[in-house]
Amino acid sequence: MEAKVEEKEPEPVENAGPDAPVRLTPMMEQYIEIKAANVDSLLFYRMGDFYELFFDDAVAASAALGITLTKRGKHLGEDIPMCGVPVHAADDYLQKLIAKGYRVAVCEQVEDPAEAKKRGSKSVVKRDVIRLVTPGTLTEEKLLDPAQANFLMAMGRTRGDGALALVWIDISTGTFRVAETTPDRLFADIMRVDPRELVVADSAFHDEELRPVFDLIGKAVTPQPATLFDSAAAQTRIQHYFNVATLDGFGQFSRPELSAISGAIAYIEKTQISERPPLMRPEREHEGGTLFIDPATRASLELARTMSGNRDGSLLKAIDRTVTGGGARLLAERLTAPLTSPKEIALRLDSVSWCLSEQTLCEALRLELKGVPDMPRALSRLAVGRGGPRDLGALACGFEAAGGIASLLDGALLPDELAAAREAIEKMPAGFAAHLDRALADELPLLKRDGGFVREGYNSELDEMRALRDQSRRVIAGLQADYIEETGIKSLKIKHNNVLGYFIEVTANNSGAMTDTDEAKSRFIHRQTMANAMRFTTTELAELESKIANAADRALSIELAIFEELTAEAVAHADSIRAAASALSVFDVSTALAVLAEEQGYCRPHVDDSLSFNIVAGRHPVVEQALRRQAANPFVANDCDLSPQRDGGDGAIWLLTGPNMGGKSTFLRQNALIAILAQMGSFVPAGSAHIGVVDRLFSRVGASDDLARGRSTFMVEMVETAAILNQAGEHSLVILDEIGRGTATFDGLSIAWAAVEYLHEKNRCRALFATHFHEMTALSEKLERLSNVTMRVKEWDNDVIFLHEVAKGAADRSYGVQVARLAGLPEAVVNRARDVLHQLEAGETSGKADRLIDDLPLFSVMLQQEKPKPQIQAKDSELANAVAAISPDELTPREALDLIYKLKELAGKA
């Protein structure tokens, strides 16, 4: 953002509005006109070295940014609120505004104030909005997280059948993806990508069926005119954007996909105004190509963020050993979208295995990778006119590192994925890389307007201009020496004043050498005669004077021209630069996962198309690292085998019982995380792992409510459980924890019981089901694929020791009172709880589970028959009658004691 000279504000003029006649300056009239075209954005109005905001924009911005709110002039009799931010710090303020959900229209001066004056004294400098800054269209380094993609997503929908598709684009890297979706998958597909901004047609935005999804997203949802999403116009829009005559090389897209592509491109053109970020060609993602993880599961497993929204404590943080921004983004992408093709998974695992087998070489690769800057984002900034010399320097630095990596890999026998990456690196534009090395100085300024970024010797005219600018005294002294030698006048001087500028001065006695001949007169032009001296100039000196006066401006002009030349060359090589950068990210992720595997003792999983799920000595990747950091006891590894018990059979279900604090939830989560890690192409925290590809992963772990939507914790649990039971199939993995705990005991037991039956008979999937309803363990007698396992504990001196070991069998207690004591409940409460528990256990009737088991046809309710009433014996009747006849309030202590002896005697006879 270049500094501009602020024009003098013209006098106010009459502006008769509908409310009342007011006097507005031409500048304020211009502001109001531009603001009227950008009502949904804060308007950054350029005035000299500041962006100023007025009216409601100023009030909102001053509050959001914590800057002073002042006033400037009046409108309709009221003071006009105003605030401003300096241009040089604009990115910092934009970052804060975007983070708070604002959109910003950047309005620049598009002509010099001197030009405006030529049109008249009251003319205002022309201004125009050059860009709309929105959450999904950021390119500035300060506004972006280097480890996180910044996706703009657009949703397309066709009339009639209502078919849906999604497009997501990161204009900071050029990534461009497209996929079809369905109404029931829409929310999950949006949250998998986690866009910064979602653009939808205004008709879809107000659709009653879709609106709940938009309300849930919690991101910036931007409705746009439906005409932008016209699938019929999409082909022309795509051809124009990519500057191609035909889309034959782009593949075939469905109508909803074309609608989404059209809306995304139209929005980019709208926000970037005259600039066109270079994008990759749209890449289609096919349904079923990645592991489906619904939003609730994604949140409960804390893949990219914890439940509180932090990156620390997430699985991504625990496994990230990347050293480049591109590598970090690729790792996050792989984690959030694991593969379902064993062949593709094996390609990634082969890369990690190779890196583990070539540790010395990989250490050298990682040293080179640490020097790789964010090339795609630097390229994007250059392409949209927001780049600087350091972005060109980033490309040069990246090329150098890529060259070093190519040299290290020369002759290496690489697995397929890494071999393809090496090939892309070797195809980087070597000529352009050499050009950058020749052109760019070693130390680069942040802004191109500062100059000094072109290497000395690259451009002779620039060197001359710099010499004139920086060494004018030496140049003048050199010319003076030339003239002394030419004329033989040793007292000749070149001097300067504000009237004549530069001139040659000689004494009157020595002036003959410059005036005696016609040749001398034409060479030395007389300027002024003094009492004792004469002054001359030459064509050469006059040109030099002009050059010196304009040297700084000319030097900067030459540098800016070179910058534009290099930028154009970079954009011309965009495809090969991005391909090389992507290849470097692949090497970064592969070596990082190898470092993780070596550091944490992970094993290579065997992934195939079977229904196997056999984890030996599995561990929770996040908890294990946390325990190591705390120097606590080592993590207790556990096996998990949900594989079919016979050939051709369905996956197994483990019913897990055990105490609170015993580690049930950790065990459930760790197996889900191991599946995700395996299918993203990572080694896993286990002794060994054989995993049949999971196509859908569902997890209902942990309790949370949704008060904003009027949902209790139990209601949220039931909604999520319903989604699992309605969608899980034989290749799915289901993790359920404490289903039914949020309601009355028998209600909860009934729901949990029926859910397990349904998973076993209808979904027929692999599942882990943790519960405190110990009656459910009886299900193993009738459900052939269900096994009981429990978390082992050891009781010692009225306390309980959690062993965190999973063993076959069933628990008969939950040790809740002991856990309450550990949590610090008052001793009186703990003691009373223990007494109540003993009384409840003593009065508990037996046989409930047996009655449920005997009633299996599936899903039927418990038989409504009552237990036969026991036959009352005569002696029992006599005792009962005696007790019934007692009036406790009328007995004296002596009578009460006698009565006790009598009742004891009757009881003995009975």
UniProtKB/Swiss-Prot annotation:
Disordered: annotated span: 1-21
UniProt entry tagged with the keyword Protein biosynthesis: no
CDD domains membership: ABC_MutS1
Alphabetical list of InterPro entries matching this protein: DNA_mismatch_repair_MutS, DNA_mismatch_repair_MutS-lik_N, DNA_mismatch_repair_MutS/MSH, DNA_mismatch_repair_MutS_C, DNA_mismatch_repair_MutS_clamp, DNA_mismatch_repair_MutS_core, DNA_mismatch_repair_MutS_N, DNA_mismatch_repair_MutS_sf
Biased composition (Basic and acidic residues): 1-11
NCBIfam families tied to this protein: mutS1, PRK05399.1
Protein name as annotated: DNA mismatch repair protein MutS
Upper taxonomic lineage: Bacteria, Pseudomonadati, Pseudomonadota, Alphaproteobacteria, Hyphomicrobiales
